[in-house]
């Protein structure tokens, strides 16, 4: 380590790989690397593991930073657990999809695609399409691809309502074909269904605890409450990271650092934060500009969220249903709702049902507190119309999913090859295992696959456990 990287007297520790972030991607990357015998440390500024899918207690309830389900048919996050000696328990699986239509109320998605022959035709076309051909649809919409195979609006509705439930877009009709169809194809191949989602049987906190145990059990380190100040790059190669001194007594303390030496760094930071830690100057202008373009607020997936607890359930057809809509009675917000207690009774006190709801908003409005407050008030009034049983909850928590965001919106031209590559150009030893960079999937499974892609690239070989399962 040269004088530019560390001052005399600084503490220095050495690793094979430093992983920045202890969310799904960081924990998966750390566990995989430790399992492969690498000396790895995973760092996160939060005291909780799990990133935006962390689970925290609140007055007897267990809540996340917005609603979460696992959308892995078995070849992604589940396989990571298997490889590191753990089991990802697939708990309750979501069932049914009630659709709210302003003016007519609730109905089932099944009522919309009455001609199952048309749906089967689309499923066969997708099964016959190799993943490589789906890459050609990065800049075209989902409905354009579907219309090649059917004009049945019910089939279009099925695919587009799934995109609303996955919270990957604000305008359901303007969703990237490739990103959606990658997931549909995986779910059909692995679970014989268009959209598979389940609750982790060990709970979200247990899921992250298991991955943390896998890291330390294989000789790695996990350091929570540790802020990475910068990635150290010299002469085009990674040399390590600098972390802030803890505890930080002065709130404006600056450049008091501990140096962690490593020839490789895997960052899981999203596009809107990564250039705060990776010096922009070490990246090519075109690549840094790609990151900054995607980091615009208007491309953030954002929603106004509600946790509402009641003594009686309010579901329409099945306790584990995922309800969705494209507009509420007084807003243009699409959204979702499910009874979290039906998926995991331990997340709420006995005799209560904890419902989680989200109203998707434009990312460009995420910093407009006045607009968000007014829209939240309108949404809450609409909730009482859509579910009269939610009018008088026994417990409530409002939240805004914006910082952290759920991801970069999956509009045509903002996915696949239009995102920054996961390997930093012109910098030896730097990878980006973030779902906001080039990746496929949904939520925690997308993050796990991004981690696997970067780990295998670092290792220079595919890990046999994962066979031919999809990853970049």
Spans of model-derived segments:
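A glycine-rich dinucleotide-binding beta-alpha-beta segment and adjacent secondary-structure elements
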Residues: 380, 385-440
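Rossmann-like flavin
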Residues: 105, 109-186
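Mid-domain catalytic core of redox enzymes
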Residues: 229-350, 472
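C-terminal segments that line or cap access tunnels to active or ligand-binding sites in enzymes
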Residues: 306-404
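Dinucleotide-binding Rossmann-like beta1-alpha1 core, especially the glycine-rich loop
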Residues: 60-133
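Helical element adjacent to the flavin cofactor pocket in flavoenzyme catalytic cores
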Residues: 186-256
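N-terminal Rossmann-like FAD-binding beta1-loop-alpha1 element of flavoenzymes
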Residues: 17-42
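Glycine-rich FAD pyrophosphate-binding loop
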Residues: 34-58
């Amino acid at each position: 380590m040269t004088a530019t990287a560390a001052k005399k007297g600084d503490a220095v520790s050495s690793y094979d790989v430093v992983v920045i972030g202890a969310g799904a991607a960081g924990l998966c990357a750390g566990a995989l690397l430790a399992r492969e015998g690498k000396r790895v440390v995973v760092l996160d500024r939060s005291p909780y593991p799990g990133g935006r899918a962390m689970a925290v207690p609140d007055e007897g309830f267990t809540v996340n930073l917005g609603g979460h389900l696992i959308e892995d048919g078995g070849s992604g996050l589940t396989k990571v657990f298997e490889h590191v000696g753990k089991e990802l328990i697939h708990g309750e699986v979501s069932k049914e999809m009630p659709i709210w239509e302003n003016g007519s109320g609730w109905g089932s998605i099944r009522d919309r695609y009455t001609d199952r022959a048309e749906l089967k035709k689309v499923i066969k076309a997708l099964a016959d399409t190799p993943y490589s051909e789906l890459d050609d649809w990065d800049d075209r919409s989902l409905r354009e691809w579907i219309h090649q195979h059917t004009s049945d609006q019910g089939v279009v509705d099925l695919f587009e309502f799934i995109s609303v439930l996955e919270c990957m877009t604000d305008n359901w009709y303007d969703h990237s074909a490739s990103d959606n169809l990658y997931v549909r194809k995986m779910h059909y191949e692995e679970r014989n269904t268009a959209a598979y989602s389940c609750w982790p049987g060990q709970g979200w906190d247990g899921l992250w605890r298991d991955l943390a145990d896998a890291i330390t059990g294989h000789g790695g380190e996990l350091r929570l409450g540790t802020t990475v100040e910068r990635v150290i790059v010299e002469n085009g190669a990674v040399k390590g990271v600098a972390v802030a001194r803890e505890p930080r007594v002065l709130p404006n303390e600056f450049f008091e650092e501990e140096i962690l030496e490593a020839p490789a760094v895997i960052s899981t930071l999203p596009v809107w934060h990564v250039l705060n830690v990776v010096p922009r100057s070490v990246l090519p202008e075109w690549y840094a500009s790609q990151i900054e373009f995607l980091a615009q607020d208007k491309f953030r997936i954002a929603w106004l969220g509600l946790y509402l607890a009641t003594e009686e359930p309010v579901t329409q057809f099945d306790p584990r249903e995922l309800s969705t809509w494209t507009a509420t009675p007084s807003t243009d917000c699409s959204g979702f709702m499910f009874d979290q207690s039906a998926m995991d009774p331990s997340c709420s006190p006995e005799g209560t049902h904890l419902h989680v709801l989200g109203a998707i908003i434009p990312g460009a409005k995420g910093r407009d507190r006045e607009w968000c407050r007014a829209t939240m008030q309108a949404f809450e009034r609409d909730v009482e119309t859509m579910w009269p049983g939610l009018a008088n909850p026994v417990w409530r928590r409002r939240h805004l999913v914006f910082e952290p965001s759920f991801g970069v919106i999956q509009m045509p031209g903002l996915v696949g090859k239009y995102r920054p590559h996961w390997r930093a150009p012109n910098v030896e030893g730097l990878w980006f295992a973030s779902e906001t960079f080039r990746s496929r999937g949904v939520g925690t499974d997308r993050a796990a696959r991004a981690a696997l892609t970067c780990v295998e690239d670092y290792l220079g070989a595919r890990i046999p456990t994962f066979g031919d399962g999809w990853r970049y």
